[in-house]
Design a protein with these regions (language model features):
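A short amphipathic helical element positioned immediately N-terminal to and/or at the very start
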Residues: 1-10
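Loop-to-transmembrane-helix entry motif
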Residues: 12-16, 47, 275-295
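Short, strongly hydrophobic transmembrane alpha-helices
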Residues: 14-39
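Hydrophobic, regular-secondary-structure patches
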Residues: 32-119, 135-139, 230, 254, ...
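Hydrophobic secondary-structure segments that place a key small or acidic residue at a functional site
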Residues: 104-115, 124-216
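Mechanotransmission and gating elements of multispan inner-membrane complexes involved in transport
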Residues: 174-181, 185-286
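Residue-level detector of conserved catalytic or cofactor/ligand-binding positions
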Residues: 296-309
Length: 309
């Protein structure tokens, strides 16, 4: 019987090899999809840790999570500096990290923030950001690069970079008159930090100080950089901010305060709850893909395995 099967397979070796190849591909796809799924979940889950709330302009929780943490999409609106200060000084708040987004550099997002970002931001298992070269920004036109930005653009310390207005990968509007200088490069994190250009909030304000119309100023209206540095560069608005509480038991009550804030419409989300919402959204697609690949795997032997004779 075994000899008969062996002869049959030999006589149909082309079909048998094709069947084995198809099965191998099906199994590889199944394993690959599962590995990608786990990798995506791990990457998303490790992007921010130790943050109790994320606050931004009123909108969907997923939208707020995606643009503030993952640099995906855009904010529906900004929130005022005064509102940020109100919650920064709240008795239940231990720390905050402000974010200002809206510009880019060769497709990489530019993030305006302050020194607390380098001191307090955590990712993964509450890991701190580390520098592979240089130091945090101190001047208005200093920039700190994520590891991928530095590697792919081949930047070194003291190199100049030009920021583009807006978030398009090929923006035609550039802040060419206000270049930044690379003063630091962060160590790899495996998070969106690696794909981010970090500048100070004052740097964001300085870039746009004569762009009131959203376009470059006419030559006669241009403000030179020496004059810019003499101005008050406190931002009028930011995009979002991270919140660390003195006690996690206050998370829901402060979230409610933010969501019912009378000065302007704001939203506060719990990062873990927003991530769970994202997993629920993706679960249907994941399940459908696994079913399709499983059916392919099951059907291949039935459809192509040669019958002994």
């Amino acid at each position: 019987m075994i000899n008969l099967i062996a002869k049959s397979l030999w006589n149909r070796k082309g079909t048998a090899l094709l069947t084995l190849f198809s099965i191998a591909i099906s199994v590889a796809l199944l394993i690959g999809v599962e590995q990608i799924r786990k990798g995506v979940r791990t990457s998303f889950s490790s992007a921010v840790s130790g943050t109790d709330l994320i606050v931004g302009a009123r909108g969907g929780s997923l939208q707020l999570l995606l643009y503030s943490v993952f640099r995906m999409g855009n904010a529906p609106n900004n929130l005022t500096w005064e509102s940020y200060q109100d919650f920064k000084k709240h008795s239940r708040v231990r720390w905050t990290i402000p974010f200002s987004l809206g510009d880019s550099h060769h497709g990489y997002r530019v993030l305006g923030t302050n020194h607390d970002y380098f001191k307090l931001f955590r990712y993964g298992n509450r890991q701190r950001l580390k520098f592979s070269e240089g130091k945090p920004f101190s001047g208005v036109f200093d920039a700190v690069l994520g590891s991928e930005v530095a590697r792919k653009r081949k930047y070194r310390l003291n190199d100049p970079i030009i920021v583009s207005h807006g978030t398009g990968s090929s923006s035609f509007l550039k802040h060419e008159d206000r270049p930044f200088t690379v003063v630091g490069i962060l160590a790899p994190t495996g998070t969106p930090v690696d794909q981010t250009v970090h500048v100070s909030l004052e740097g964001i304000t300085a870039m746009h100080i004569d762009w009131e119309s959203g376009a470059p100023p006419m030559e006669e209206d241009r403000i030179d950089n020496e004059e810019v540095l003499k101005r008050d560069l406190t931002p009028e608005a930011i995009t979002a901010f991270l919140v660390g509480l003195r006690s996690k038991i206050h998370a829901f009550s402060l979230q409610r305060e933010v969501n019912t804030y009378r000065e302007e419409p704001l939203s506060a989300i719990l990062p873990g709850a927003a991530l769970q919402e994202l997993w629920e959204l993706l679960r249907t697609a994941e399940t459908g893909l696994r079913v399709i690949l499983s059916l392919i795997h099951i059907s291949e032997p039935t459809r192509r395995t040669p019958t002994p004779y």
